[in-house]
Amino acid sequence: MLADEPSTNAAASEPSVKLAVCVLASGSKGNAIYVSDGQTAILIDAGLSGVEIERRLDSRGLAPDRLQAIVVSHEHADHIGGVGVLSRRYRLPVYLNRKTAGATKRIGRLHRVNTFDCGTVFHVDNLHIHPFSLSHDA
């Protein structure tokens, strides 16, 4: 293709999206995933202690104080263990579905709660999050 010819490659005209995903923990003892587009950083679940999540973020050069939110997938203990502590310590809003919001007594006081409906897209700054339902056994 010559330089002055129009591009027929649709991907060439699409904006470049960079997404960093770091699995901090995955398993029955705790789940936590760091997601960032370079400007907005969130945690999906915080199932370890707040101190352990901070330690794992720090060990990967990720600053806990740069997080903008925690998104909780569901209310099982291995997904919510550090949510309350991190939300209070870093003044992070917590996004959870309505059913999970009913379990916040186990999480403790949260800085700010935002509920979402599965199937409805919501945004945390630049990140577009499309939650959906799955069956999950404990």
Label each residue range with its predicted role.
Residues 1-60:
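Conserved beta-strand hairpin/beta-sheet module of binuclear metal-dependent hydrolase folds
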Residues 50-96, 114:
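Active-site metal-binding motif and surrounding structural segment of the metallo-beta-lactamase
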Residues 26-28, 48-50, 76-77, 134-138:
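Short beta->alpha connector loops
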Residues 20-23, 49, 70-73, 131-134:
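Short, flexible loop segments at the rims of nucleotide/cofactor-binding pockets, characterized by
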Residues 13, 34, 61, 84-86, ...:
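Short secondary-structure boundary/capping segments
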Residues 97-138:
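Metallo-beta-lactamase
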Residues 35, 45, 74, 94, ...:
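Divalent metal-coordination and catalytic microenvironments
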Residues 38-40, 88-92, 108-112:
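Short glycine/proline-enriched coil/turn segments at helix->beta-strand junctions
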